[in-house]
Curated annotation (Swiss-Prot):
Subunit composition and interactions: Oligomer; homotetramer or homotrimer.
Job description of the protein: Beta-xylosidase is an intracellular xylan-degrading enzyme.
Keyword Hydrolase in annotation: yes
Listed name of the protein: Beta-xylosidase
Family: Belongs to the glycosyl hydrolase 43 family.
Keywords recorded for this protein, A-Z: Carbohydrate metabolism, Glycosidase, Hydrolase, Polysaccharide degradation, Xylan degradation
Catalytic residues of the enzyme: D14, E186
High-level lineage: Bacteria, Bacillati, Bacillota, Bacilli, Bacillales
InterPro entries from the UniProt entry: ConA-like_dom_sf, GH43_C2, Glyco_hydro_43, Glyco_hydro_beta-prop_sf, Glycosyl_Hydrlase_43
Gene3D superfamilies found in the cross-reference section: 2.60.120.200, Glycosyl hydrolase domain, family 43 (2.115.10.20)
GO molecular function, one term: xylan 1,4-beta-xylosidase activity
Annotated site residue numbers, Important for catalytic activity, responsible for pKa modulation of the active site Glu and correct orientation of both the proton donor and substrate: D127
A GO BP annotation: xylan catabolic process
Enzyme Commission number(s) of this protein: 3.2.1.37
Amino acid sequence: MKITNPVLKGFNPDPSICRAGEDYYMAVSTFEWFPGVQIYHSKDLIHWRLAARPLQKTSQLDMKGNPDSGGVWAPCLSYADGQFWLIYSDIKVVDGPFKDGHNYLVTADAVDGEWSDPVRLNSSGFDPSLFHDPSGKKYVLNMLWDHREKHHSFAGIALQEYSVSEKKLVGERKVIFKGTPIKLTEAPHLYYINDVYYLLTAEGGTRYEHAATIARSSRIDGPYEVHPDNPILTAFHAPSHPLQKCGHASIVQTHTNEWYLAHLTGRPIHSSKESIFQQRGWCPLGRETAIQKLEWKDGWPYVVGGKEGLLEVEAPAMSVKEFSPTYHIVDEFKDSSLNRHFQTLRIPFTDQIGSVTENPHHLRLYGQESLTSKFTQAFVARRWQSFYFEAETAVSFFPKNFQQAAGLVNYYNTENWTALQVTYDDALGRILELSVCENLAFSQPLIKKIIIPDEIPYVYLKVTVQRETYTYSYSFDQQEWEKIDVPLESTHLSDDFIRGGGFFTGAFVGMQCQDTSGERLPADFKYFRYEETTE
């Protein structure tokens, strides 16, 4: 059997992999999307299912007002002492000389069980991880952020002991690794293998220069010797390789005594409008997760098949275990809670923004703030996970003024999105409006307004994504569809387009209701269909 990469498609970056018996788990970053952290489960490293979203409460994660691409960065999941340990950052500032953020620890007996309230650890840098030393001690590592003028912001990897009984860091903080000439050293994971400490880090930034570096030492606090063929993982030297941005990795030893590395990757698409300065492409699916096999030579791990990684990887020698789908193609909102694959922005899904029970078999969203808000949006969405798909919904919405709108949205962040919405025109009544926001440049490109007949209870909305472009359509009866002849660029919903590539999520599609008049006018969505297609 083969592992086919990426194993986690769509926005699923910064994988932290661990094993509990014969079960395998990966935690990935969620940034400003709520609930915080996604944990996937596998029995064979081939098939993965979304098993849990552990940070469900605002006592664990309060992101209201967080910036775009703030929130949960680089969680680290581990299993020790009969329980799961999850450590994560909540980043409050992403621009400028400071990187304000706080690092927390939560625990649970099972990944899909109740997670504890958080222990606040420190705020000295991001990408924290927890290491369980064979001595019984526990240590927290994180990159150290230095805001000072004439100092490099990435000041190295810091190590400090954590007291389980006192629930706090104790002893001296020590920088144990300053990184390599690749620079931008972050994402530390520490392993103890055959009496040697191995420190795995990410370097080079999280764009196309991304890489994974490994170093080793006989002592936990160093000094650390760098791998003789470092970096052990990168695709920067191979611009035509289908897996790009390879880096930010973690390691697991299987119960069959094989070694694998989970890592971040991106799959770029190219556009006819591409300039000579953008030769690497765009990744609208965001940063995804792939798995590579490792082999050991002279006490060092190497990626089998080359340091850029493979699309198909030899699977471990264990029984294959497939899972039933956790997301149905059509969701008719028959359950008492949202499907796990849906998320909201910054805040939990509560009756402040919506309900799946108030109008049976509907998702009701109460009009809140606009798509540019970092506070209270009524927006329920899921990831783009394919370059070719359709998403469709039906909305019942009767606005009374132009500040009320509801519909289908494709979204990257508050500065980059498109929306086909039912809204109101003073002269025409209910209409459909297409809105486009690209790096905060706002436009409404429809020349002729689409009038909705008074007797129509539901307006059907659809988006068709075909690799580098996507288009909206609408119908008043779900039979006859009218395509809106405004092709939109998928590349504009990618890390690589957003203000020059400084952000970290991926494209989402979903349902939204806004009422900037403050009346909270509700919209009822009858279903949501997400279906992957072929070229």
